């Protein structure tokens, strides 16, 4: 085991704070509408230019192991804020830096770190309560666009496209961000339920213009097994042919004579039919088939529950206004399922999302909710170069997280104003000794830091602006983009309450850990014994002795 280097007390904290400051100083220059760019070196290709705090934080690794520990802990602040609300990473970093620096000063002056931590924790709880009370619901398209614009560093086109996407697919709909092919941003909206399975045979195509199979007002047969024997399907096919409607089959697989017979029937016009594989795999496939059944008002034919294809009637089939199948995707539009059943299914999946600990599972469950409840929108980001594309895509994703957070917990005045207003709530804190009071005061100063940094980045005088904002009430604040004072909500400078709240909570939680650190352990740096070159190999004797081995 390698030898360890151990540092205690002030010398440990000093090195740690140095690391905190290096990372925070690099991140905080990006804060606000006049935030500066940070250029990140890449191992190949052009460097990345970004104004996204979390991208900057991720890149930073320091040579000194003790300083690096401090930097990594502040990185954790950005990650926590990003995970909870998807934005507010730079604000959280600025808050954490201020709490750490003020807290370490107090500890060095001889105060008890644990009481300081208790004071900070009590203050945070009161401030969070105040932020929640200040929140206003965010339900109209204009507000959503403004939140998106602010989060995308003032890019109005991004705010507008996100607001359009949310309007079209609803609050529950899935919105994904992809790299586009042109210079302009585009929005594609898929109504109804779409899954990534295409037709099993090109002979099902009936619309040559867009190479798709379109069925109007079809019956939908859902089967949880492979179909290879056509005899099993005959009763259903005959019943559907009599009804004079098309049939969409969604099964685990359809092969051999079953598929061949369906193709022949379709081409001869006996029954208009199309077949696709069921989406997903294993248990997820069963769940998704059940989702489609509920959406279309049908039943999944599964031998596990005693249902067989031979005994299937028209009552077991689902229906929809239209089914559109391309080579890669199937879209079911206007499923005839009962609203109450769909709502109950959505609630059930939401419960699973709450109980799930895996991010991947949560994402897949959220997609299922969207497919049942709203629809899917794809924002295709346009840009002039790859460097710009990466930077813009990161901003669009940030803005999307922000708008979701705004819809969830409401909005508050942006530009650091809400934190300034929440300072008043710290007077309610029940601090039982001077050290806890000092902890509350550390938080009081830290909550001014984001506004100070926004003003500093805009080239203004921080102290003057903070004093003026404190004199005002409600959402009165400083618009750094225009350098004017006024009502932040009216000027459209909004932040999601969830982002402001989670920034403060993440910063206080990690900063408290740093303040209460008393010892640090790291690997001793290893000496390079070989001196950089290869050791002497004794000339290898000219290899002449190898002749006898032939």
UniProtKB/Swiss-Prot annotation:
A GO term, aspect molecular function: ATP binding
Pfam families (alphabetical): Cpn60_TCP1
UniProt-annotated location(s): Cytoplasm
The reaction(s) this protein catalyses: ATP + H2O + a folded polypeptide = ADP + phosphate + an unfolded polypeptide
GO terms for cellular component: cytoplasm
Iron as UniProt keyword: no
EC number: 5.6.1.7
Gene3D superfamilies, per the entry: GroEL, GroEL-like equatorial domain, TCP-1-like chaperonin intermediate domain
Coiled coil, from the record: none
Biological process, per Gene Ontology: protein refolding
Domain of life of the source: Bacteria
Presence of the UniProt keyword Metal-binding in the record: no
Record key words, sorted: ATP-binding, Chaperone, Cytoplasm, Isomerase, Nucleotide-binding
InterPro entries reported for this sequence: Chaperonin_Cpn60_CS, Cpn60/GroEL, Cpn60/GroEL/TCP-1, GroEL-like_apical_dom_sf, GROEL-like_equatorial_sf, TCP-1-like_intermed_sf
SUPFAM superfamilies: GroEL apical domain-like, GroEL equatorial domain-like, GroEL-intermediate domain like
Complex formation: Forms a cylinder of 14 subunits composed of two heptameric rings stacked back-to-back. Interacts with the co-chaperonin GroES.
Functional summary from the UniProt entry: Together with its co-chaperonin GroES, plays an essential role in assisting protein folding. The GroEL-GroES system forms a nano-cage that allows encapsulation of the non-native substrate proteins and provides a physical environment optimized to promote and accelerate protein folding.
Family classification: Belongs to the chaperonin (HSP60) family.
Full protein name: Chaperonin GroEL
Organism: Marinobacter nauticus (strain ATCC 700491 / DSM 11845 / VT8) (Marinobacter aquaeolei)
Gene, per the UniProt record: groEL
């Amino acid at each position: 085991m390698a030898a360890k280097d151990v540092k205690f007390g002030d010398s440990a904290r000093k090195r740690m704070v140095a690391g905190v400051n290096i990372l925070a100083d690099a991140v905080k220059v990006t804060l606000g509408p006049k935030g500066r760019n940070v250029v990140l070196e890449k191992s190949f290709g052009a460097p990345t230019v970004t104004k996204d705090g979390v991208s900057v934080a991720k890149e930073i690794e320091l040579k000194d192991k003790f300083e690096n520990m401090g930097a990594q802990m502040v990185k954790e602040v950005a990650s926590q804020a990003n995970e909870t609300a998807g934005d507010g990473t730079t604000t959280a970093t600025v808050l954490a830096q201020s709490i750490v620096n003020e807290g370490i000063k107090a500890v060095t002056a001889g105060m008890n770190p644990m009481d300081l931590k208790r004071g900070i924790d009590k203050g945070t709880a009161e401030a969070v309560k105040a932020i929640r009370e200040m929140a206003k619901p965010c339900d109209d398209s204009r507000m959503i666009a403004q939140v998106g614009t602010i989060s995308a560093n003032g890019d109005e086109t991004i705010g507008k496209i996100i607001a359009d996407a949310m309007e079209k697919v609803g609050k529950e709909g899935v919105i994904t961000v992809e790299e586009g092919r042109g210079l302009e941003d585009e929005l594609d909206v898929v109504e109804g339920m779409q899954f990534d399975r295409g037709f099993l045979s090109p002979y099902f195509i009936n619309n040559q213009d867009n190479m798709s199979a379109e069925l109007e007002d079809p019956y939908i047969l859902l089967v949880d097994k492979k179909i290879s024997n056509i005899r099993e399907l005959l009763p259903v096919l005959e019943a559907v042919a009599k009804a004079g409607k098309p049939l969409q089959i969604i099964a685990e697989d359809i092969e051999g004579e079953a598929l061949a017979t369906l193709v022949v029937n379709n081409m001869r016009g006996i029954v208009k039919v199309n077949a696709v594989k069921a989406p997903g795999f294993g248990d997820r496939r069963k769940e998704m088939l059940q989702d489609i059944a509920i959406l279309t008002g049908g039943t999944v034919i599964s031998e596990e529950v005693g249902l067989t294809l031979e005994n299937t009637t028209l009552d077991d089939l689902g229906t929809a206004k239209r089914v559109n199948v391309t080579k890669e995707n199937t879209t079911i539009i206007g499923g005839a399922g009962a609203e109450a059943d769909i709502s109950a299914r959505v609630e059930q999946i939401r419960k699973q999302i709450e109980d799930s600990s895996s991010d991947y599972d949560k994402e897949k469950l959220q997609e299922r909710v969207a497919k049942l409840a709203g629809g899917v929108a794809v924002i295709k980001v346009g840009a002039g170069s790859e460097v710009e594309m990466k930077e813009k895509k990161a901003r669009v994703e940030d803005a999307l997280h922000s708008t979701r957070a705004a819809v969830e917990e409401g909005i508050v005045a942006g530009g650091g104003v809400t934190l300034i207003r929440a300072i008043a709530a710290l007077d309610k804190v029940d601090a039982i000794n001077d050290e806890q009071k000092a902890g509350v005061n550390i938080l009081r100063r830290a909550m001014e830091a984001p506004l100070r940094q926004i003003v500093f980045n805009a080239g203004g005088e921080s102290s003057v602006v903070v004093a003026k904002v404190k004199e005002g009430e409600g959402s009165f604040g400083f618009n750094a983009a225009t350098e004017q004072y006024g009502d932040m909500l009216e000027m459209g400078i909004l932040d999601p309450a969830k982002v402001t709240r989670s920034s403060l909570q993440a910063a206080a939680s990690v900063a408290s850990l740093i303040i209460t650190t008393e010892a640090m352990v790291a690997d001793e740096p290893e000496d390079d014994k070989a001196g950089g070159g290869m050791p002497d190999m004794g000339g290898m004797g000219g290899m002449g002795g190898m002749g006898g081995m032939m």
